[in-house]
Amino acid sequence: MENLKLKMIDFTGKSENVVSERDMIFSFNNGEIKIYLSYETGELKKIEIASENEKIEKEIEREAVLKFKGNSVILDYEYGLYEYVEIEIEDKLEKYWADGKIVYLKEGKKIFLEIEIWEGYLLFFDDEYRMAGFGTESKNRKK
């Protein structure tokens, strides 16, 4: 994660001089992952795990919530208009093994950005920062 570089995305539609360095946030289980980026360079500054009691969505004016549920991942997020995404593995995703990871990727999508949102849980985005898939990391994979 230390070398992760991103283009800055203005999720809130604000102008450059009022956008804060807080760019993305994922809620997972009873906590949040905050991802801080530099507006000027797009480089990752730090990642924090916050308690569920913090009022983060008010602070950053947007929210992304990820839920793993059986063979699906559900991602709710605000991006201009509210968008709801639910992916069923059996119907829409291709499964791969890559570098000790199980990767579920939407057909025809390529991974531009990988973010570990929780230990061993990964989200993948395409070059338009739309979710391309998700995966899990297996450090002790049996061959």
PLM regions with names:
Residues 1-21, 47, 52-103, 141-143:
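Intrinsic disorder/low-complexity detector
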Residues 11, 26-28, 68, 112, ...:
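Phenylalanine-focused residue identity feature
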Residues 20-34, 100-116, 120-121:
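Exposed beta-strand-loop-beta-strand "reactive/processing" segments of non-cytosolic proteins
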Residues 31-33, 43, 130:
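Short acidic/polar mixed-charge low-complexity motifs
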Residues 111-143:
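Mixed-charge, glycine-accented linear interaction segment located at domain edges/termini
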